[in-house]
Amino acid sequence: MSAFTPASEVILRHSDEFTQRRVLFAGDLQDDLPAQLETALSRVHTQQYHHWQILSRVLGENAHYGLFASAETLADCDTLVYYWPKNKPEAQYQLQNLLALLPVGSDIFVVGENRSGVRSAEQMVADWAKLEKIDSARRCGLYHGRLDSRPTFDADTFWDEYPLGELTVKTLPGVFSRDGLDIGSQLLLSTLKPHMKGKVLDVGCGAGVLSAMLASFSPKVRLTLTDVNAAAIASSKATLAANQLEGDVFASNVYSDISGRFDMIISNPPFHDGVQTSLDAAQTLIRGAVSHLNTGGELRIVANAFLPYPQVLDETFGSHEVLLQNGRFKVYRAVKSRAAKK
């Protein structure tokens, strides 16, 4: 989160525009531009816990993490800089929340990579603000307008659900497995035997699909679910509640907020951060697993077959095995021995 993203570089081309503004930065923010850009006030709202961790070190209480922006978050702000995500429903969800709280007459800047669909911004907010494209660079578009009226934001209308066997999965925009069980998770689940016991950590839990399915055929497991995405945390809590299942669900940047040890760690680890490919989280997941597993405990993950995880698994655990694979995915298993690196 050190180098500026292309979207932030476009904002920097207009840095003089912001020196007297009280700015709220929100959306798919992936760098520390709010801490670097000269403004009268810089405040951040993010749904990504790992981004909040970094920005809060510099911005302190002006960095906010959570599912929704609050009136307090937007208090005294006269400008919104919104980073367009790769997921259109997520953008709609976040923008309606933000514009419902932003004072009428405030300036709105929307920036994002062309391939992420930022062109949709004009039509999406047309009922409340007229956006015009003011710059195009670094394969990004920058749009500007003023808020003419506030939308009504009803968070309940953005919830979705789908059946999975006898389970109900609850989801919000921007959450992995929002539209159904993905092939990778299905492959991982097929390797889990029924009637398992012990403490299980689900890292990058998304909508809680893996944990809910596991608990449905192994009711004695004790579940801990974590994710960086506030929408995923809310979705997982809702999925467990909808199926009368129990588990601890909270935000953690891989192991940042994890204490204790587990008998199994399961994950379908992400390798995209926004629209950029990143293996950092998955490698942190593997390398840190031995510090959070009991001796004899195992890490079981599913990943795209082309990703370079075998070497990291062997360096960390001493060995690994491929439990199952198809043309696209592999399910890896690595067991913590007494000799495993810590």
Swiss-Prot record:
<protein>
    <recommendedName>
        <fullName>Ribosomal RNA small subunit methyltransferase C</fullName>
        <ecNumber>2.1.1.172</ecNumber>
    </recommendedName>
</protein>
<dbReference type="InterPro" id="IPR013675">
    <property type="entry name" value="Mtase_sm_N"/>
</dbReference>
<dbReference type="InterPro" id="IPR023543">
    <property type="entry name" value="rRNA_ssu_MeTfrase_C"/>
</dbReference>
<comment type="function">
    <text>Specifically methylates the guanine in position 1207 of 16S rRNA in the 30S particle.</text>
</comment>
<keyword id="KW-0698">rRNA processing</keyword>
<comment type="subunit">
    <text>Monomer.</text>
</comment>
<dbReference type="Pfam" id="PF08468">
    <property type="entry name" value="MTS_N"/>
</dbReference>
<keyword id="KW-0489">Methyltransferase</keyword>
<dbReference type="InterPro" id="IPR029063">
    <property type="entry name" value="SAM-dependent_MTases_sf"/>
</dbReference>
<dbReference type="GO" id="GO:0005737">
    <property type="term" value="C:cytoplasm"/>
</dbReference>
<dbReference type="InterPro" id="IPR002052">
    <property type="entry name" value="DNA_methylase_N6_adenine_CS"/>
</dbReference>
<keyword id="KW-0808">Transferase</keyword>
<dbReference type="InterPro" id="IPR046977">
    <property type="entry name" value="RsmC/RlmG"/>
</dbReference>
<dbReference type="InterPro" id="IPR007848">
    <property type="entry name" value="Small_mtfrase_dom"/>
</dbReference>
<keyword id="KW-0963">Cytoplasm</keyword>
<dbReference type="GO" id="GO:0003676">
    <property type="term" value="F:nucleic acid binding"/>
</dbReference>
<comment type="similarity">
    <text>Belongs to the methyltransferase superfamily. RsmC family.</text>
</comment>
<keyword id="KW-0949">S-adenosyl-L-methionine</keyword>
<dbReference type="Pfam" id="PF05175">
    <property type="entry name" value="MTS"/>
</dbReference>
<dbReference type="GO" id="GO:0052914">
    <property type="term" value="F:16S rRNA (guanine(1207)-N(2))-methyltransferase activity"/>
</dbReference>
